[in-house]
Structure formats: structure tokens, C-alpha cells
Amino acid sequence: MLAEDFIREARSAQPELPPPQLLQLVAYQEALPENAEGDDQNAVFRASVLKALSKNFSQEDRPLIRFLLEQEIVFHENSWGIFESIRLCGALLFLLAQAGDVGLLWEAKTANFDTMSGFDIQLLVGAGVTQTLAYLQQVEEEWAEDARIYLEECQQAGDFQNLECYREGLRASLR
């Protein structure tokens, strides 16, 4: 199946996620030991779906993008390094600008040592710094407090001063 065909089939199920038999094509699947491709049998196809999706996406694609990010998080929790696919998921959710995605984006940021340094903190505040911090203030969970404190420190350090330039740069990179 081609990535474009996968997206077309996935969109036919909107606003719900596609059926499990379709999702299994992009779900994290631990690779067999002799597989030289990496730790995830579906990583390459998932990356091609993300690349194709990034050319034309909307709010209706958000459940699928979130699912893809969940798979990338599991992949990164079980591997070293950071791959472009997790960054691309983050970029798409950043551009969709929903404060409710910050929890999943925080999971991506903290998936491993390399994502902590290589997954841009700006990706967590697509809805805006104030809106994201207000959302986190309402969530009574430990991760939310950790994320809020980290974001406040980043705000004080000036990491969000050029957020609109960052947004425009992401948009331009997807064209």
C-alpha cells in the first residue's frame, strides 16, 4: 500500500480513527532481531505516511496524527536517538494549535535522552504559551506540573520570543 492510499482510506473513517487492520500498518511493531531496518517494522511506512500527510493536513486529521505520534513515542522509548518522524508529528500538532495536545507532546519530548534535547520545546506551545500554561494549570497530574514548570523556565529564558517566526518556518518547511 502507498502512503497516499493509506491516508485516503484513513480519511474515509473520519472523524474516527481508521479500523484496526489499517492502523496496524503504522503501529509500532517490534522488529525481529535479524531486521537491519531498525527496531520497528513499521517505522519506514509510518514515516512515509507522515511525509505525505504533511503536504496536506487539517484538524480532521488530528486523531490520526496523534495516533502516529503515540507510535513514535513507543518507538523512541525503545530506541536511542531521535528520528525526523517524531519531530514531524510534533510540527503537525503544533500547527494544528490545540492546547489539549500538550500532554502527548510532553511524552514525545521526554521519551528518551535524545528527544529531551532534540524535540523542540516550541512544539509544545502551538496553541500559544499563555493558553498552554493555563491548560496545564488545570490538569492535576504530575506530568502537567513538570511540563508547566519546564515551559515557564523556557519562557523566562526567552525560548518563545519568536514563536510566530518559528511557526512560519515550520509552515515553509512543509511546502
Residue ranges and their predicted role:
Residues 1-57, 150-152, 170-175:
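N-terminal alpha-helical scaffold/docking segments in eukaryotic complex subunits
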Residues 26, 43-44, 49, 74, ...:
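Extended aliphatic helical segments
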